[in-house]
């Protein structure tokens, strides 16, 4: 082994030590702390045998968790550096009082290859630390990364499915999938959620916060996944094809929902009335019928609505906004559904046909009104007069009620 170059200087404990923050230390169990202590003691012993640190001065100093300022404050449990257990020499079987004296004794064996070059010693120390901390004996996990000690092992196991988690709170959130527990309640509408992060995203529907903005069109979204899905609109990509009808979709979730049109599957059931829905969002909207919650209030007239989209449409009454334009005649409409109905004037389309007489209509409401012609006439209970339409009967009855 080459002699040490004086220009390179001594290797000190700080060069090869690994330190914890207070938070990291708190994540280690007793076995992991003892393992860390053993490795640091070996590092110190090797340096002591080279005369690179003063073991006698620090020998009895306790190893405290905290910010390291030297050899005596390695981040480890409180036992003293000097251990009372005898240490056997692997070369000659001699018993030494402690690990420091064993290191000094090892130097008496010329065949022992001591590192006098700081670079060689530093590399040896890193390899030794990796080997110690990554070995599988005793179930000790690997927790060295970037010359610091971290818990990379996932030590919290779900007893139901065996999935492992690195933090206890993540395991707790996961276990709610098995129990169905929903502990996070929205203070505005009362809906319950399994995870706090899901509740936080939901609450943005009440506050109006939309932190994720598309850099193409400026449209903002409640959560990042919605932004990612939206951005495929600009690329035009539709990679998901329905095997039944060949229709293409931008997102796999939309394809899955669409395929329920063919299968008739409605997996989302209301616990209140037993009604089933094709997608979860429809169930959430329906559930508000039972809760009676109307969380979205109009700042102009004070009227409340169950959904933000309904509030947005209502507010056009006050603003006069008509964002939907007919490309045939240039007429504007406040609702897209009204524009679609209007466009049938230009196309001649009449999609709603009477099953009795075959007459077709522009809108479903017109068809329903027409179908009363084929049903029994409506009779006034007061005077016995008959009417074709229920609406006409109701107007007539006001004559009797005043």
Swiss-Prot record:
InterPro entries named among the record's database cross-references: KRAB, KRAB_dom_sf, Znf_C2H2_sf, Znf_C2H2_type
Family: Belongs to the krueppel C2H2-type zinc-finger protein family.
Name of the protein in its database record: Zinc finger protein 547
Species per Swiss-Prot/TrEMBL record: Homo sapiens
Keyword Oxidoreductase carried by entry: no
GO MF term list: DNA-binding transcription factor activity, RNA polymerase II-specific; RNA polymerase II cis-regulatory region sequence-specific DNA binding; zinc ion binding
One matching Pfam family: zf-H2C2_2
Residues covered by the KRAB domain: 11-82
Superkingdom to which the source organism belongs: Eukaryota
GO cellular component, one term: nucleus
Keyword line: DNA-binding, Metal-binding, Nucleus, Repeat, Transcription, Transcription regulation, Zinc, Zinc-finger
Localisation per UniProt entry: Nucleus
Positions of C2H2-type zinc fingers: 87-109, 156-178, 184-206, 212-234, 240-262, 268-290, 296-318, 324-346, 352-374, 378-400
Alphabetized PROSITE patterns for the sequence: KRAB (PS50805), ZINC_FINGER_C2H2_1 (PS00028), ZINC_FINGER_C2H2_2 (PS50157)
Gene Ontology biological process terms in this record: regulation of transcription by RNA polymerase II
Gene3D superfamilies named among the record's database cross-references: 6.10.140.140, Classic Zinc Finger
Function of the molecule: May be involved in transcriptional regulation.
Key word Transcription present: yes
Gene: ZNF547
């Amino acid at each position: 082994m080459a002699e040490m170059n004086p220009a390179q200087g001594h290797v000190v404990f700080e060069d090869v030590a690994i330190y914890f923050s207070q938070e990291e230390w708190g994540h280690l169990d007793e076995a992991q702390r003892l393992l860390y202590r053993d490795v640091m003691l070996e590092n110190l012993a090797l340096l002591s045998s080279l005369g690179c640190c003063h073991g006698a001065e620090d020998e009895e100093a306790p190893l405290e968790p905290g910010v390291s300022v030297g050899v005596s404050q390695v981040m480890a449990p409180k036992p003293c550096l000097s251990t009372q257990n005898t240490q056997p020499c692997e070369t000659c079987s001699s018993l030494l009082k402690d690990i420091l004296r064993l290191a000094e004794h090892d130097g008496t064996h010329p065949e022992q290859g001591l590192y006098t070059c700081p670079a060689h010693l530093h590399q040896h120390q890193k390899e030794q630390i990796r080997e110690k901390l990554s070995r599988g004996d005793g179930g000790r996990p690997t927790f060295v990364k970037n010359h610091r000690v971290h818990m990379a092992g996932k030590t919290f196991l779900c007893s139901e499915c065996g999935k492992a988690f690195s933090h206890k709170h993540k395991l707790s959130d996961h276990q709610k999938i098995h129990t169905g527990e929903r502990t996070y309640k929205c203070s505005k509408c009362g809906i319950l959620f399994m995870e706090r992060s899901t509740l936080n995203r939901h609450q943005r529907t009440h506050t109006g916060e939309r932190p994720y903005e598309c850099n193409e069109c400026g449209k903002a979204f409640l959560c990042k996944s919605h932004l990612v899905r939206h951005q495929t609109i600009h690329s035009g990509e539709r990679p998901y094809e329905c095997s039944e009808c060949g229709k293409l979709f931008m997102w796999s979730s939309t394809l899955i929902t669409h395929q329920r049109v063919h299968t008739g599957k409605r997996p989302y059931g209301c616990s209140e009335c037993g009604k089933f829905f094709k997608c979860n969002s429809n169930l959430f909207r329906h559930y508000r019928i039972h809760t009676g919650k109307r969380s979205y209030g109009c700042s102009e007239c004070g009227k409340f609505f169950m959904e933000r989209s309904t509030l947005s449409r209502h507010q056009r009454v006050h603003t006069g906004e008509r964002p939907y334009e007919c490309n045939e005649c240039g007429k504007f409409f406040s609702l897209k559904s009204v524009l679609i109905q209007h466009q049938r004037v230009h196309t001649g389309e009449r999609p709603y046909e009477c099953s009795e007489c075959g007459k077709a209509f522009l809108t479903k409401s017109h068809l329903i009104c027409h179908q009363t012609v084929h049903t029994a006439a409506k009779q006034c209970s007061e005077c016995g007069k008959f009417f074709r339409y229920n609406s006409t009967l109701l107007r007539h009855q006001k004559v009797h009620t005043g």
